[in-house]
Amino acid sequence: MKKQKVFIIAGPTASGKSGLALSLAEKIGGEIVNADAFQVYKGLQILTARPTPEEMHGIPHHLYGYADNDAQEDVAGWVQKAANVIPEIKNPIVVGGTGLYLSVLMNGLSPIPDVSPEIRKEVRLMDPKEVVAKLEKGTVPRDIQRQRRALEILLETGQPIEYFQNLPKKNYIDADFYPVVLLPPREKLYARIEKRLIQMLEQNVVEEVQKLLVSSASGGVMKAIGVRELIDFIEKRCDLQTAAEKILLSTRHYAKRQMTWFRHQMPSAKILKTPEVTDVITL
C-alpha cells in the first residue's frame, strides 16, 4: 500500500512559512496542520502570529488554539494529536518553526514514561541548584527546563533520562515526508521580524497580554517571546519602546537559533530562500 505523502514546511519565525503553506494548500487541495509550540494555545493569537479565520482563506487548519492557557502542552501530546489528524487528511501540509515537533513527527520519540502530577509539582517548586544537586545519575542538561525534566524522570522511575532516550524510538505515523525549510537571507528575515512586531503593536498586542495577565494564566503560553517584556511594560517597569526593543532582540536571537537547528537537524530538507510554491510542488 502506498504511503501517505506529507509536506513539511519549516523555517524560522517570520520567514513566510504560513503564506507558503496556504499557497500550497490552495494548489493541491491540501489542509494545514500546525507545528508551532505556542500557536497551540488559545491565548495570544496576535503575539504568536496564529492565523485568523480571515487569513485561513477557507482552507482547513488543524491543531491551532486547542490548548488552554493553563495547560503545559509538550511534544508528546502534540505528536499524538498530529498522528490522529494527519491520516484523515488527503493532502496534509505540516507547518511550523518548532523543530523538535517536526523531528519527532518524522523520526519518532523515545519512550519516556509519564510523570505523576505530584512529582512534577515537587520538581517545579525546587530551586535550580537543588535540581542539579539531585541529578546524581547521568549527565546534567544545560538549561533548567531540561534539568527539571531529567529529574522528574529520575524520581519517577529510578532511571536517568538517557536510559529511555537510548531505547528504540516510537514512530507515530507511517508516511513519506517531503520537508522544505525556508531560510531567507538574514537581513530580509530581520526586516520581516521588525515589520511583524510593528504590526502586532498596532493590533493591540499589549491589550492581549494584559488580558492573559488578568486571567492568571500559568501554562506554556506564558513562555512565548514578548510576554515577559510586555508584562514589564504593563507593570511600569519599562516604557513601551524598551519592551519592543527587547522583543525584537529576543526574536532575532530565536530566529538565529532556529536557522542553525534546521540546517543541522534536517539535512534532507530542500532549502528555499524565497517561498515559491512551485519549488514545493515539484518535490
Predicted segments, located by residue:
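Phosphate/pyrophosphate-binding catalytic cores of soluble transferases and nucleic-acid-acting enzymes
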Residues: 1-283
